[in-house]
Amino acid sequence: MASKVIHAIYNDDDILMNAVKKVRAERYHIEEVYTPFPVHGLDKVMGLAPTRIAITSFLYGLVGLSVATLMMNFIMIEDWPQNIGGKPSFSYIANMPSFVPIMFELTVFFAAHLMVITFYMRSKLWPFKKAENPDPRTTDDHFLMAIDAGHHDVEKLSKFLHTTGAIEISLIDNDEDH
Amino acid sequence: MYTLPSKLKLFAIVFMVIGAIGIVSGFLTAPKTTAEVKEMMAAHGDGHGSDASHEAPHHETATTHEAAPSEGHQDAHSSEEAHLEHTLHQMQNRPWSALYIACFFFFMIALGALAFYAIQFAAQAGWSQVLFRVMEGITAYLVPGGIIMFVLLALSGFHINHLFVWADPEVVAHDKLLQGKASWLNGTWFLVRAAIFLGGWMLYRHFAVKFSRNSDDETDNRWFKKSFKISAGFLVFFIYTESMMSWDWIMSFDPHWFSTLFGWYVLAGMMVCAITTIALITIFLKSKGYLEVVNDSHIHDLAKFMFGFSIFWTYLWFSQFMLIWYANIPEEVTYFITRIEQYKLPFFGMLAMNFLFPVLLLMNSDYKRVNWFVVLTGIVILAGHYVDIFVMVMPATVGSSWYIGIPEISSIFFFFGLFIYVVFTALTKAPIVMKNNPFLKESKQYHY
């Protein structure tokens, strides 16, 4: 079903922030906001849920720590406990100080890389992905707010958006799903 | 203006009195002769576990010698006497060490707060101005704490007590290594250095506070610029003197041992304690309604510093430990062998208190804003760093005769009471939030 979306373009992040507040106060649904740079507090005024990526990172770190511990315990203690320079390979804890640098690095490695990959997957970013950019100016100096026109009166909505400081307003037929 | 509540004053005085009584009783109950040591050891069933294991080989040699002919018997007797003498010295050192550790612990909080204060000026931080008066209050302890510290150092450096082995001329006469270090480690030069360090720190503290108070009555940035300059100068002075202070006041307890990153290690512990104390006093004052301008974000920043410096401390602790453990050079590794054999629980326990606890509790951004979380972690961190100083000092002075009993706890009580009294009295001397600083407005509106 083809839905209609209104694209309102702003040229200042402060005006955009105020516009977002007003639009939300009028209970219109904001589909998306496109900005050329991070606007501090935009997620808060849009009412977006906080990210959980730090929690995933912590869990990945624990995985990395486990991998390091299990790997070195198997290799250095269980599989072939050689005497290497007199280091005590009787138990993992007896030789632990020499394993700590690797435990630390693998924790960081897993936490960092898996978190980045999670970020790419969750935000659907990969090479050769088709850019979802409604207006190329939003990567330079313009801000675009996409509002679901839905069952609203388009005339009234456009007038309202003008009062929030939009410099351009256009009605878009949104028939492709991305 | 903050007024010292009479309840808090009473609280501090009670702690000081109880502590003082305990300290005196600690000195009175310390044994004076080897006969008393023998009695005490018999009464306590050879003390605690680590004590017994340490003494077992000595007793064995003593009994085997006793079975031998008469000339061997005398040997046995003298070796037992030597052992008792050794234990006597350890037990006599205990109340002194307990006093020294508590004194240094609270002194280093004030010193760390002073360094942190100077860093805030030199870095032109934009969040901490509303906390400056709290920091100034904490650094007020630098003067009385430093004077007590100096007296203790003088008593030890001139061998009134046996805390520093290098201060005993008889020991030095038979010790080539100590003779080699005597040009640095001798009573006079030791005290001259201590006077220079303490004098420099107190001088900066005096002028930093004076400039800060002066700026309250001005509208221009004259005093801020002066504070900035002396803070930058102080930080240079501080990093050299702090390093030497740690060799003198802590590392020289084990004068046969040395470690190059020791100064940093002491500094890291000092900074954690100072920032934790700043956070605790800030939360306390805010809860009493004196620091309305302080918001969650300020607490969050302090908690981040607590978290970060805890990890930094652990990094240095591990770097020092692991390098020595790995290379296992006999003259270096004895330091850790005595600690692991005789101080297993405090030595590894402090790692849990100073690392695991803050890392797990303060990792979450939301928890850093919850006051009781910060207070809980802060108390554990402070206790952990007391144990850290304990494990740095005690093995060299009392060895296996350690215990956390009346002398240790009383010393903590006494200096805690003094610290509270001095800090909160100092807080009444000036408005609790400064009036004029170019970053003040930013700090008041600080939001993270």
What are these regions (language model features)?
Chain B
Residues 110-115, 147-148, 194-205, 268-283, ...:
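Hydrophobic cores of alpha-helical transmembrane segments in multi-pass inner/ER membrane proteins
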Residues 373-383:
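Central hydrophobic cores of alpha-helical transmembrane segments
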Residues 6, 260-266, 331-351, 399-423, ...:
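Membrane-interface transmembrane-helix boundary segments in multi-pass integral membrane proteins
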Residues 2-17, 97-98, 129-147, 186, ...:
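Alpha-helical transmembrane segments and their helix-start/interface "positive-inside/aromatic belt" motifs
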Residues 254-258, 329, 367-371, 392-407:
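Extracellular/periplasmic helix-loop-helix junctions in multi-pass membrane proteins
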Residues 26-44, 103-215, 234:
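Transmembrane-helix bundle segments that line or gate the permeation/cavity pathway
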Residues 1-91, 162-183, 209-228, 290-297, ...:
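Extramembrane terminal tails and long inter-domain/linker segments of multi-pass membrane proteins
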Residues 20, 55, 60, 64-84, ...:
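Long, contiguous internal "core" modules enriched in hydrophobic/ aromatic residues
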